[in-house]
Curated annotation (Swiss-Prot):
Protein name per UniProt: Small ribosomal subunit protein uS14
Record organism: Photobacterium profundum (strain SS9)
Function noted in UniProt: Binds 16S rRNA, required for the assembly of 30S particles and may also be responsible for determining the conformation of the 16S rRNA at the A site.
UniProt entry keywords in alphabetical sequence: Ribonucleoprotein, Ribosomal protein, RNA-binding, rRNA-binding
Protein's gene: rpsN
Lineage, uppermost ranks: Bacteria, Pseudomonadati, Pseudomonadota, Gammaproteobacteria, Vibrionales
GO BP of this protein: translation
Length: 101
């Protein structure tokens, strides 16, 4: 189980990403715009750098919904490999069963 503080930190990051998403996107459009002046582009870069680090979506980490485990995360289920196996063996995931050939 992950520490509660780690889960809380990820939740905080998710809120910051949602809060600053539009602002970051607008600044990135200005930065990548070839027709914008160098001064405007530079100012956009400075404004982007002044935003909180945790507002970047690349700082988010996928975590298991049940345990908070960061490694072995399966996007399709939102769970770690361990919890997917446990729930599969109990028959709690419809249509999923152990492979045998």
């Amino acid at each position: 189980m992950a520490k509660e503080s780690m889960k809380a930190r990820e939740a905080k990051r998710a809120k910051l990403v949602a809060k600053f998403a539009e602002k970051r996107a607008a600044l990135k459009v200005i930065i990548s715009d070839v027709n914008a002046s160098e001064e405007d582009r530079w100012n956009a870069v400075l404004k982007l750098q002044s935003l909180p680090r945790d507002s970047s979506s690349s700082r988010q980490r996928n975590r298991c919904n049940q345990t908070g485990r960061p490694h072995g995360y399966l996007r399709k289920f939102g769970l770690s490999r361990i919890k997917v196996r446990e729930t599969c063996m109990k028959g709690e995931i419809p249509g999923l069963r152990k492979a045998s050939w």
